[in-house]
């Protein structure tokens, strides 16, 4: 059962805002039927039209046919798998690599519980979440760049 807080209509600040027009129908036109029947279909059909037009005008170019007998020396995954690929490539024990990969979402799931005492929405007033985000971004970029390099320079990125 949810508890809904009702506005205090005796509050002078709220009464002043309501007198100026804030509240119901604040923007001057109702959402139904104007937005739901006219604006949204135009946006959705326009997006679909742009995608179909781009697909027709610029079809995907296929490269050379695959030759299973001549594989490249090092096969790289798609760019969004580079950090995971680097973890599996660098850690000698594959089970430890899989545990580290599972630890990333597990660690992200713990952040709201660690910072549950902080009720601010501003990210600069939530130091734990901001630190986890910044460190995670730096580590993911570092691992992603390292995955594109040879294995001997991948950890140091050639700096050391």
From Swiss-Prot:
Membrane-crossing segments per the record: 36-56, 95-115, 131-151
PROSITE patterns (UniProt xref): CYTB_CTER
Molecular-function annotations in GO: electron transporter, transferring electrons within cytochrome b6/f complex of photosystem II activity; electron transporter, transferring electrons within the cyclic electron transport pathway of photosynthesis activity; oxidoreductase activity
A Pfam match: Cytochrom_B_C
Location of the protein in the cell: Plastid, Chloroplast thylakoid membrane
Protein family membership: Belongs to the cytochrome b family. PetD subfamily.
Protein known as: Cytochrome b6-f complex subunit 4
Organism taxonomic ancestry: Eukaryota, Viridiplantae, Streptophyta, Mesostigmatophyceae, Mesostigmatales
Gene name linked to the record: petD
């Amino acid at each position: 059962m949810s508890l809904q807080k009702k506005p205090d209509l005796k509050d002078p600040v709220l009464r002043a805002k309501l007198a100026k027009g804030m509240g119901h129908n604040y923007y001057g036109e109702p959402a139904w039927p104007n937005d739901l029947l006219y604006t949204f279909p135009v946006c959705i059909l326009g997006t679909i039209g742009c995608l179909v037009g781009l697909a027709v005008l610029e079809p995907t170019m296929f490269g050379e046919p695959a030759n299973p007998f001549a594989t490249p020396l090092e096969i790289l995954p798609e760019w969004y798998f580079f950090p995971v690929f680097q973890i599996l490539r660098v850690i000698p024990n594959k089970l430890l690599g899989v545990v580290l990969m599972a630890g990333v979402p597990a660690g992200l799931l713990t952040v709201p519980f660690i910072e549950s005492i902080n009720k601010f929405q501003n990210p600069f007033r939530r130091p734990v979440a901001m630190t986890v985000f910044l460190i995670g971004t730096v580590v993911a970029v570092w691992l992603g760049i390292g995955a594109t390099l040879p294995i001997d320079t991948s950890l140091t990125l050639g700096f050391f």
